[in-house]
Amino acid sequence: MDEECRNCPSLCETRTQVVHGYGDVGADFLFVGERPTTQADAVGVPFAGAGGRDGNGGLRRMLERLGLCDVTSPADAPALENAYLTNLTRCRDPDRRPTDDEIDTCEPYLNAEIRMINPEILVPVGERALTELGTEYTTTPADALVLPDDHATRIRGRGFELVPMIDPHEQTDEQTQTWLETFAQLMASDYRQTKGRQER
């Protein structure tokens, strides 16, 4: 992956570094956010410091509770098992969300990661990721894919099953617990049979 990408000139001026995907390259579960967090931009690991009511790593705690992240591993180098983390865009502007053009420009990187990882389950984290992944990998119209309605639901798609979540920093404790219970049930099921099904 290109560590010196210059495809989005304005983002090149605001980023600290290009933040590509991170985690287990043989993972079944691929988590996709919208853009790098502030801490991710600093350390180069997607979702670093993301979410939680205290702003201290809500997604990481969720992964730990599911057994997908070693509790003892450092924040800037989490030990992930069966999980891979990435974003729609690789660079951060601290003052705004990415434009549609910037997401389109980064799409080849995301597509390359999806092909490389070949996951069973895609986890869109946040509304933008749900819209982008849902449009690409399901037959559901984009305007029918919304959060919080689709939070912690299982959406069958073309080659992947999607399990959307609200951004961790926006989740209530109840929403977090609901998503964890749904995902734990999925992990205990024969989820690998979802490949190739073409439904909602």
Predicted regions, residues:
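A polyanion-binding, active-site-adjacent surface
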Residues: 1-200
